[in-house]
UniProtKB/Swiss-Prot annotation:
A Pfam family of this chain: SOSSC
Protein name listed in UniProt: SOSS complex subunit C homolog B
Family stated for the protein in its record: Belongs to the SOSS-C family.
Classification of source organism: Eukaryota, Metazoa, Ecdysozoa, Arthropoda, Hexapoda
GO cellular component assignments: nucleoplasm; SOSS complex
Spans annotated as Disordered: 44-73, 105-125
Protein's GO biological process: DNA repair
Origin superkingdom: Eukaryota
Length: 125
């Protein structure tokens, strides 16, 4: 009688393992699992003087807070000559512009002719 009891136990553990795997798959598909990062390992951001204190946000709220800068970043970076570096900022400037230096092409109207020495009429050589 001991043998059927152990196979029943193994079937039960296999079922529990499969249920756990299925729930993890569903959570990963929904983006709920934090992939090993916990809030206890993260250091709180330093508070600047004059800023109101806020409570620490969960990872879902952090991603929704960064949506407006990211929404502004995509069309801005696709329509300019330069590019932008996203950053975290206390002052609201979440994008740093990096603009290239453009060299002006030399045109005949803007170039000056070479200077040639003119002989002085009072002092002929």
């Amino acid at each position: 009688m001991a043998f059927p009891n152990t196979s029943a136990q193994q079937a039960e553990t296999n079922r529990k393992i499969l249920e756990e795997i299925q729930t993890k798959k569903q959570l990963l598909a929904g983006g709920i699992i934090n992939l090993g990062l916990s809030n206890t390992n993260q250091m709180p951001a330093p508070q600047l003087l004059g800023q109101p204190t806020t409570t620490t946000a969960t990872p879902d709220l952090v991603s929704t807070n960064s949506t407006p800068p990211r929404a502004a970043f995509n069309p801005t970076s696709s329509t300019t000559l330069g590019f932008f570096i996203p950053q975290d900022s206390y002052f609201g400037n979440s994008l740093i512009p990096v603009l290239p230096r453009l060299e002006l092409p030399a045109t005949p109207s803007t170039t000056t002719p070479p200077i040639t020495p003119i002989a002085n009429a009072n002092n002929p050589k």
